Amino acid sequence: MRAEHLRFAREAPQGGVLHCFVLDCSGSMLGGQRLALAKGLLIALFDRASAARAEAALVCFGGAGADLRFGPAVPRWWNERWLRPVGGGGGTPLASGVRQAAQVLERSARRKPAQQRWLWILTDGRSGDQPVRPRHADEVVFVDFEREAIRLGRCRTLADAWGAALFTPDELIA
């Protein structure tokens, strides 16, 4: 066997996709059943991730801080019974939620560098926080649950600053 008989085949990276969802569980999301709507939307988004064999993670923020509730993993048994205990109330520590998500995305980037990482932020934007866009988020989507007569437009402001997509829940459900 000689050197010309050896062949090197470069394989395309198979990093997959991670969808990191950040759910606003603050008191303002309880009004108008926004949190219930957000939970229903999350169930649908997790079902899509599961069907696509994509990984998902869920960070919830409200009250005094944020915590990782699921993942990152391929959601297999995601259903309403798992999400029902996620309650709401208190302040809107958006920066804490984004910081927690940034840690999830950073760990994912180290573990699977070729993975495409999506950050979804489901909030009404009723926070004075102006967090910076997480460095390891390849794509960012804001889902704006603000429905007040006088809108603050903070989701739009952050989406514009981050170069992110902005949707209402109705646009994603339709």
Where does each model-flagged region fall?
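Acidic, polar low-complexity linker/tail segments
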Residues: 1-20, 28-34, 51-52
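Structural motif
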Residues: 18-20, 116-120
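Short beta-strand/turn micro-motifs composed of small residues
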Residues: 23, 60-62, 121-123, 144-146
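Short acidic, Gly/Ser-rich segments with clustered Asp/Glu that frequently serve as metal-coordination loops
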Residues: 25-36, 126-130
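An active-site-proximal "capping" alpha-helix that borders the catalytic cofactor pocket
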Residues: 36-52, 57-58
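Short beta-strand-loop
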Residues: 55-85, 130-133
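Von Willebrand factor
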Residues: 66, 76-117, 126, 144-153
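VWA/integrin I-like adhesion module and closely mimicked acidic/polar interface patches used
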Residues: 125-170
